[in-house]
Amino acid sequence: MTQSLADMRRDYTRDGLAEAQAPGEPFALFHQWFADAVKTEQVPVEANAMTLATVDGEGRPHCRVLLLKGLDEQGFTFFTNYDSAKGQQLQANPFAAMTFFWPALERQVRIEGRVQKVTAQESDAYYQVRPLGSRLGAWASPQSRVIAGREELEGLVKATEARFSDTQPHCPEHWGGYRLLPERIEFWQGRASRLHDRLNYRLVDGQWLRERLAP
């Protein structure tokens, strides 16, 4: 390592976040920031990439990067194998947190709330627009299970291709979407000298309360 970790830092001076810029509810601001990220972030950064944190039945946290695939007034939607590690964790503890980080904009959004499965119709609608290889992979991969090697996975894919050689694959019951219903959304804008702007929205009795947090 050529540079000390203690010396690795950058100052954030691109923008600020004032209450006057922020609407009374968080979804409009998220849409605005997400649109900015789509326009500004460059490959390999994916604007809809997020870290999803879950907690298992023993209270141990787990996190991984996923892609956001849906957003409406209800919440934030992602898709996965229901039998995967994250699926089992959400079964045991249906609360999760998401973090979006857009480095070019010096922005971060943190979201916390309860997670519930979307309808089978919603899962199928998204499944059908995925590339064929991804649809077959949802059937082939025993996600999060221990396998002997890459060859085993490739064999499972070949078997799945043969199974659906004469028909289009349909959405498996073990695969589908989750929607995080937000109870808290924090917008973070990097500022100079680590005096960042943090606007936090909390859902209280069905209404969003906006407040500023110290950096």
UniProtKB/Swiss-Prot annotation:
GO biological process, one term: pyridoxine biosynthetic process
Cofactor annotation: FMN
A matching Pfam family: PNP_phzG_C
Keyword Flavoprotein set for record: yes
Co-factor binding details: Binds 1 FMN per subunit.
Pathway(s) annotated for this protein in UniProt: Cofactor metabolism; pyridoxal 5'-phosphate salvage; pyridoxal 5'-phosphate from pyridoxamine 5'-phosphate: step 1/1; Cofactor metabolism; pyridoxal 5'-phosphate salvage; pyridoxal 5'-phosphate from pyridoxine 5'-phosphate: step 1/1
Assembly and interaction partners: Homodimer.
Protein name: Pyridoxine/pyridoxamine 5'-phosphate oxidase
Gene this protein is translated from: pdxH
